[in-house]
Amino acid sequence: MIRSHEHLARKLGIPFRDPGLLRNALTHRSAEGVNNERLEFLGDSVLGFVVTEYLYQRFPSADEGVLSRLRATLVNETSLARIARELELGEYLILGSGELKSGGYRRDSILSDALEAILGAVLRDQGIDACRALILTLFERPLSALSLDDWKKDPKTRLQELMQGRGLPLPVYTLIDQSGLPHDQHFRVRCEVPLAVEPCVGEGSSRKKAEQQAAENMLSRLSDQSRFRV
């Protein structure tokens, strides 16, 4: 059963004047009625603008190339899907029967598109200031952890170097699930390292993306352990 969209609005802290905009943002193209593609287009643009503005102000000495790479570490399908999962966005999506049966509510591409569509809906309903505030809230953790070195190394490389620097075995990645149609696959990968008691799981539209997300999730977990600096 789809959870109440009013509940999601409260979770976001957005009092929508037009609740229909939020419903549209959560409606996948596989469902009947107005879908979220136009709002996604708008949300993608405002997200890029707000993150670019933030980076420009925070790193005044960084050149255009560095700023672009930093933005790419923040604005991508994997990071957006991770935030969408933190919001449990899949439980609010309106999907067609085929997408519902195939687990579309778990798919990175659908989750990230829906999150961008929500940002577009907030922009339309509340204006740029409210939309900017929401983006900075949703991205607060990755933004606060950002450094000028982030664009140089991907999560798998950083995790591998962390293990090597401590003389520990390298991370182990295991494919635990693969589903979806041939043109729209969904992968789940488990990452295990000696520093963590429990493994971390990553998801993505390819095994490579799932491994990168699993590594990033593991780095986030280790960064919460005060004796490790990731």
Swiss-Prot record:
InterPro entries: dsRBD_dom, RNase_III, RNase_III_dom, RNase_III_sf. Its main location: cytoplasm. It catalyses: Endonucleolytic cleavage to 5'-phosphomonoester. Signal peptide: none annotated. Its EC number is 3.1.26.3. The keyword Cytoplasm applies. One of its GO terms (molecular function) is rRNA binding. Pfam families: dsrm, Ribonucleas_3_3. Residues 202-230 are annotated as: Disordered. Homodimer. This is Ribonuclease 3. It comes from Methylococcus capsulatus (strain ATCC 33009 / NCIMB 11132 / Bath).
